[in-house]
Amino acid sequence: MLSYYAFIFFAKIMEVALMTIRTVLITRGEKLYGSIIGFIEVTIWLYVTSSVLSGIKDDPIRMVVYALGFTCGNYMGCVIEEKLAIGLLTINVITSESDGKRLAEILRDENVGVTMVDAEGKIEQKKMLIIHAKRKRREEIIRTIEGSDINAMISVNDIKTVYGGYGIRK
């Protein structure tokens, strides 16, 4: 009986983790991969759900194990998605005019594509650096910015599509 509970628990974790990854893939425009994962996901769901529901009155622990698997699956799906880092992002950096030029140079030396535009702050002129990159490079780019000893305001946005650009083609 313990192995049956373990099966329900781990199968539900796998199903929900796949659901999380499928959702991310589809929202990022990866329809084919999302659909393939969806097929596997729903196959697992049908098997596990039908086996839990078939004897739930006689063995209500199945329901608890199923719910625990669901909870852990959500967590695991998020962890896996963070590791895969599928997709693209935009990093906007606002800094002083002189620091902006220096930071753009530092980033370009790290093979990061940077667009620099003039911006106007409350007190002084600023530079805004716009960076489009793969999500896998997020931490590396932010570490480079923070390690440059330049006072900068950084914002990061997930994006779905970028046409053209430097260093982000599939």
Curated annotation (Swiss-Prot):
<feature type="transmembrane region" description="Helical">
    <location>
        <begin position="1"/>
        <end position="21"/>
    </location>
</feature>
<feature type="transmembrane region" description="Helical">
    <location>
        <begin position="36"/>
        <end position="56"/>
    </location>
</feature>
<keyword id="KW-1133">Transmembrane helix</keyword>
<comment type="similarity">
    <text>Belongs to the UPF0316 family.</text>
</comment>
<dbReference type="Pfam" id="PF18955">
    <property type="entry name" value="DUF5698"/>
</dbReference>
<keyword id="KW-0472">Membrane</keyword>
<dbReference type="InterPro" id="IPR044035">
    <property type="entry name" value="DUF5698"/>
</dbReference>
<dbReference type="Pfam" id="PF10035">
    <property type="entry name" value="DUF2179"/>
</dbReference>
<keyword id="KW-1003">Cell membrane</keyword>
<dbReference type="InterPro" id="IPR022930">
    <property type="entry name" value="UPF0316"/>
</dbReference>
<keyword id="KW-0812">Transmembrane</keyword>
<protein>
    <recommendedName>
        <fullName>UPF0316 protein CBO0591/CLC_0646</fullName>
    </recommendedName>
</protein>
<dbReference type="GO" id="GO:0005886">
    <property type="term" value="C:plasma membrane"/>
</dbReference>
<dbReference type="InterPro" id="IPR019264">
    <property type="entry name" value="DUF2179"/>
</dbReference>
